[in-house]
Amino acid sequence: MVATGGQAQDQSQNQEPDVLNPTSAVTGLPQKRYYRQRAHSNPIADHSFDYPARPEDVDWRSMYPSIQQGQQVSFADVGCGYGGFLVTLGEMFPEKLSIGMEIRVKVSDYVVDRVAALRRRCADTGAYQNIACLRTNAMKYLPNYFSKGQLEKMFFLYPDPHFKRAKHKWRIINQALLSEYAYVLRKGGLVYTMTDVEDLHKWIVTHMEEHPLYERLTEEEANADPITPKLYQSSEEGAKVVRNKGDHFLAIFRRL
């Protein structure tokens, strides 16, 4: 029987077109195009965040359902973007808990949904239970989440360069914040920085070398680190730089 115009319209209205589904029918993962947001966010703006008064108040079990008694987050990917490198950390270090910290709401929503989808897809193995994403402003609230000497590694990959001189104070690496990072890093802990902007790289190196609690790894030490090869294109931003044949500027620092 041929559908009349009214019947065809009803059928069309009752159908949910796949194009409106934010989850891919093929991979089961969220589709990035439904979570697009401007590339950067003003970290000084008065965003509305719920944050704990102290690290002991953080409900880590809500983010890591399989967390063990006494287990703590060891790695922090600050400004994790769409979570590509965070996922890599979860795969490389299955016994460690890694957190991605992202200020942009849609982007952090994407990472949360991505992690949830990966957990569902790997329910039989329990993979990706060791990664999570938190929407927050790391420039303001880092000590609210981590206790003294808790973190083993921190990552600052392709941060906002804030090109204008008046906005340099917004850069994620500056003297005041370096002291906070030193507080939450254990002695011997590592800070990984990567950018495709040479001016920002020089800024990072200068500020970290001037700080008394950090020393830069030698080129040999950096190249021997198994994480180093992953820094170039595990993140979405890094992969874009590779596609565009851009430059990468790497510097890794040890907490003294």
Curated annotation (Swiss-Prot):
Its EC number is 2.1.1.33. Its main location: nucleus. Pathway: tRNA modification; N(7)-methylguanine-tRNA biosynthesis. It comes from the Eukaryota. Gene3D superfamilies: Vaccinia Virus protein VP39. The keyword DNA repair does not apply. The active site is at 160. This is tRNA (guanine-N(7)-)-methyltransferase. It comes from Drosophila sechellia (Fruit fly). The lineage of its organism: Eukaryota, Metazoa, Ecdysozoa, Arthropoda, Hexapoda.
